[in-house]
Amino acid sequence: GSSACFPALRPREIDGVKYIDGGWRDNMPLDLAAAMGAGELLAVDVNGVGITRPNTTGLPTRIIRSHWNLGPTLDFAPERAARNIALGYFDTMRLFDRMGGTAYGILPDSSAFLKNFAERYQLRLAEVAARSPAIDLVEKTARQLANYPAPFAPNPSAPTAAALAPLELAAEHLNVPADMPYTPKLLAATVMGSFEKDPADRFPALLDGKDGSLVAEKAMAAAAPEEFVTALVSRTLADVPLF
């Protein structure tokens, strides 16, 4: 275990045998589980220090990974531990299709909010692209850099993880807490309550066609694509009823 993490901590000795953290051989010993008779594998990748070997077992395998930085190896703060437990729970529920989203724990929701948001977001994005064709690449770059899925083709407004991605990306950019579950509508409302100055105000020429320096705004969007997507999400949510 981590109590034997070498060289940060000394090896542990049990019955005359010294032990160090297993991560120095394999962080996810899937081959060991297979050798012990497992017919299906469920692994957790915490992106920790050590070696993670490729899965060569040939067994059906699911791997739980976190979108978030889980903190330093030796950070034992109770607050971080509680946050990581919540994030791990959401990651597991998402893997088994009990929750949606990519980074946040998105609860099942029968309302039409996500569909309406996705349709309006794509319409807004198309309007901006008509003013600046390169903006599509900016939006896709924001998703890629922040590890969110690309727009779902052939229907980019379908209520999928890809359709939810811009909303999650904006939430992450605005530091919306990830250790609690949200419906899409609640996440949207939390996003809209997370700023004092509307991010969309930085892009009046791009988003609304108002007089301004389109060239400067295009450069700003390219330099900080996550800020542009956050602004576009804000402008989209202004058009979608939340209550």
Which residues fall in each region the model found?
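Patatin-like phospholipase
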Residues: 1-243
